Regions:
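FAD-binding subdomain of flavoenzyme oxidoreductases
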Residues: 2-167
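Terminal amphipathic helices with adjacent charged low-complexity linkers/tails
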Residues: 58, 139, 164, 171-234
Length: 234
């Protein structure tokens, strides 16, 4: 994708050895994509093989029509679950909140809240299913534009609270590509290599941030805005 100026947003630590199918079926994400650009968010359609040998391509009209003829009860049950879920406003809100943070526990139920088309629901149920629902043979996803200019910084804060507050403020600007928090114990593991970290308060925190931009000018403007925001914490 790089020659086309695009990239696949999920970026798990195992990216160099991972395959797209494995990333999707495990809902592997990484530091940068969070929940806004993980496998669930970039998925458009899937081609799957069900336990009975049926092949379904959710992005193909003929395949969908054929599946409706051969598996009407299956589709109807999916739609019944959707209707039952969406009628419960309290449950819907709880599901949205649970999946607004990284959540790979069990099978995802978010599609029943976010989609009305049963085939979109089926496709997104595959994310994180680890092969328990069907074999994933093909997937169509969206990609994002590569932003070639990047800046990163390790920020030190006197308290965990101030570090977390700074992350929230920086996130609200929409300028961050990634932010990772380190507590005092994590900082101690690298003190030997970075003596300047020694002597920090016991409640100190650190935040590793990254911001990306299409042009150098845009990157400088982003950095200037972030520096102004962070001056409050200095």
């Amino acid at each position: 994708l790089k020659p086309y100026g695009r990239y696949f947003t999920p970026d798990p630590a195992s990216l160099k050895s991972a395959m797209v199918g494995g990333i999707v079926m495990n809902n592997a994400s990484g530091m940068c994509c969070g929940t806004h650009a993980n496998s669930y968010r970039v998925l458009k359609s899937v081609r799957i093989i069900l336990p009975d040998g049926t092949i379904l391509d959710t992005g193909d009209k003929e395949s969908r029509a054929q599946f409706l003829m051969t598996h009407p009860k299956f589709v109807r049950k999916i739609d019944d679950l959707r209707i039952k879920t969406q009628r419960n406003a309290v449950l819907c809100e709880r599901i949205r909140r649970k999946y607004s943070i990284k959540n790979v526990t069990g099978l995802t139920i978010l599609p029943f809240v976010e989609y009305n088309d049963p085939f979109d629901i089926i496709a997104h149920l595959m994310v994180g299913s680890e092969g328990t629902l069907a074999f994933l043979s093909s997937i169509t996803v969206t990609t994002s534009e590569i932003q070639p200019y990047t800046a990163s910084a390790l920020l030190l804060f006197p308290t965990t609270k101030s570090a977390c507050e700074a992350i929230i403020e920086m996130k609200q600007t929409g300028l961050l590509s990634a932010a990772e928090f380190f507590d005092r114990k994590a900082i101690r593991t690298v003190e030997k290599d970075f003596p300047e970290l020694q002597g920090l308060p016991d409640d100190a925190g650190a935040v590793l941030i990254r911001t990306d931009a299409v042009t150098e000018k845009e990157l400088l403007e982003k950095n200037k805005t972030l520096q102004k925001l962070l001056s409050y914490y200095s």
